[in-house]
Curated annotation (Swiss-Prot):
MF terms in GO: mRNA binding; structural constituent of ribosome
Function: Forms part of the ribosomal stalk which helps the ribosome interact with GTP-bound translation factors. Is thus essential for accurate translation.
Protein name: Large ribosomal subunit protein bL12
Gene that encodes the chain: rplL
Quaternary data: Homodimer. Part of the ribosomal stalk of the 50S ribosomal subunit. Forms a multimeric L10(L12)X complex, where L10 forms an elongated spine to which 2 to 4 L12 dimers bind in a sequential fashion. Binds GTP-bound translation factors.
InterPro entries: Ribosomal_bL12 (IPR000206), Ribosomal_bL12_C (IPR013823), Ribosomal_bL12_C/ClpS-like (IPR014719), Ribosomal_bL12_oligo (IPR008932), Ribosomal_bL12_oligo_N_sf (IPR036235)
One of the Pfam families matching this protein, by short name: Ribosomal_L12
GO biological process, any: translation
CDD domains named among the record's database cross-references: Ribosomal_L7_L12
Keywords (A to Z) from UniProt: Ribonucleoprotein, Ribosomal protein
One annotated Gene Ontology cellular component of this protein: cytosolic large ribosomal subunit
NCBIfam families: L12
Family label: Belongs to the bacterial ribosomal protein bL12 family.
Amino acid sequence: MNKEEIIQAIKEMKVIELVELVKALEEEFGVSAAMPVAAVGAPVAGAAAAAPVEEKTTFDVILKDAGANKIKVLKVVREITGLGLKEAKDLVDSTPKPIKEGVSKQEAEEIKAKLEAEGAVVEIK
């Protein structure tokens, strides 16, 4: 398999498959796909040191739009939230709405990938 064939195969994958591929590559090669924090230029002499920025540890997953495939999105919402059919339908029909709040970044990304795989528009805050 050459480079172009690999790229084409990746282009044809669904979001959830890409997430699984990245995890497998991280485990196989002992690396992280997280973007490194870019170093900001050295402060100018006499400039006050900037306060350290706290990294966010909990995230909210917001369903912005269910898309054209509402039934499949509804099933995923029920699976994620444990809501009944009526409650999940009301949530999906009244977007934008939070699906899950106070979750880890990894869990938020997994939820987003599942919903986007079914055609939903999702935001992580």
